Curated annotation (Swiss-Prot):
Changing I106N: In FUR1-7; causes resistance to 5-fluorouracil (5FU). Induction: Induced by uracil. Transmembrane segments: none annotated. The modification Phosphoserine is found at S82. The gene is FUR1. It comes from Saccharomyces cerevisiae (strain ATCC 204508 / S288c). This is Uracil phosphoribosyltransferase. GO terms for biological process: pyrimidine-containing compound salvage; UMP salvage. Its cofactor is Mg(2+).
Length: 216
């Protein structure tokens, strides 16, 4: 279901199961193995929800009982693009759902003094303009890195309506800023936090996702 006030923001159903998963990964005392395990579970849910929004066409197949089944098949090709480093944690979840999926990478780092993003590196599939793109980054805080990454994709010929931005936690500020720049991009998220602190980190948040996932 789309999350108001933006039609292209989709919040996962806030079930007890999902809230339980977030309780574990937000807990500062959670061990690294548990943080990885339960984060991966949420990532899988985000990927599955993202796949639900891809266009399909009707397809009829014959079953082993010699009967026809009317189903659907996906129209087009997809790829994942992770915003390095934290976004790489979401790549396996996409691979688990989509066999032989192609993965690109964009490295954007935040200036700790200005909190502004800076592009350092990009490696994308040559035919990315022909694909639907799952942009992967666990946290949407200020929106600066996500906006820059999306600009890179658009410059490579990807249409905004073919981009699906998947993240575990986002801020209202980040959504507003990102949506103002790219209203046609779909955002699929699992949690909406109340805001940012003086260091531009999500609150209540969970700390630095990349550090906790990769144990740095």
């Amino acid at each position: 279901m789309s999350s108001e006030p933006f039609k292209n923001v989709y919040l996962l159903p806030q079930t007890n199961q999902l809230l339980g998963l977030y309780t574990i990964i937000r807990n500062k005392n959670t061990t690294r193995p548990d943080f990885i395990f339960y984060s991966d579970r949420i990532i899988r849910l985000l990927v599955e929800e993202g796949l639900n929004h891809l266009p399909v066409q009707k397809q009829i197949v014959e079953t082993d009982t010699n009967e026809n089944f009317e189903g659907v098949s996906f129209m087009g090709k997809i790829c994942g693009v992770s915003i390095v480093r934290a976004g790489e944690s979401m790549e396996q979840g996409l691979r688990d759902c989509c066999r032989s999926v192609r993965i690109g990478k964009i490295l954007i780092q935040r200036d700790e003094e200005t909190a502004l993003p800076k592009l350092f590196y990009e490696k994308l599939p040559e035919d990315i303009s022909e694909r639907y793109v799952f942009l992967l980054d666990p946290m949407l805080a200020t929106g600066g890195s996500a906006i820059m990454a999306t600009e890179v994709l658009i410059k490579r010929g990807v249409k905004p309506e073919r981009i699906y931005f998947l993240n575990l936690i986002c801020s209202k500020e980040g959504i507003e800023k990102y949506h103002a720049a790219f209203p046609e991009v779909r955002i699929v998220t699992g949690a909406l936090d109340r805001g940012l602190d003086e260091n531009k980190y999500l609150v209540p948040g969970l700390g630095d996702f990349g550090d906790r996932y990769y144990c740095v």
